[in-house]
Amino acid sequence: MRWITRSHVHVDRVACPWLITRFVDSDAEFLFVPASQIEKVAADTGAIPFDAPGVELGHHENRCSFESIILKYGLKEPGLLRLAKIVHAADIAEDIDTDPIARGLEAIASGYSLRYPNDLENLDAQFEVYDALYAWCRLDVAKNKA
């Protein structure tokens, strides 16, 4: 399937494609366009919009888009839910200090945006970061259960 969001990816617009690819649609194709073109391009291509104003898989009821995707697709793995807390805090400015990892993730996202201005290249580079962070989240959850 095709998925569409705003260009110039940052925390949520990198985390969401990672989540979609790893847990929802392993053959996902991502399109990045200016916010003003999302509705038209989504209609023309059949792409599913995310992390854009007014879309189902966006910010709603104090959720970031990553959390909206988790909710929509019924994802419940504890490590993934731990990662969602980090992504939320890193993406929502007023919540940045609600998780000790958030400022680091936001800084990493900023650095990758400087190194990789092309959105697809940025995703390719950052997916490894999210794979590693997810592995850590699974370990963190396991340690805190004991």
Question: What are the residue ranges of the model-derived segments?
Answer:
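Extended, well-folded catalytic/binding cores that form a central cleft or groove in large enzyme
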Residues: M1-H8, W18, R22-A146
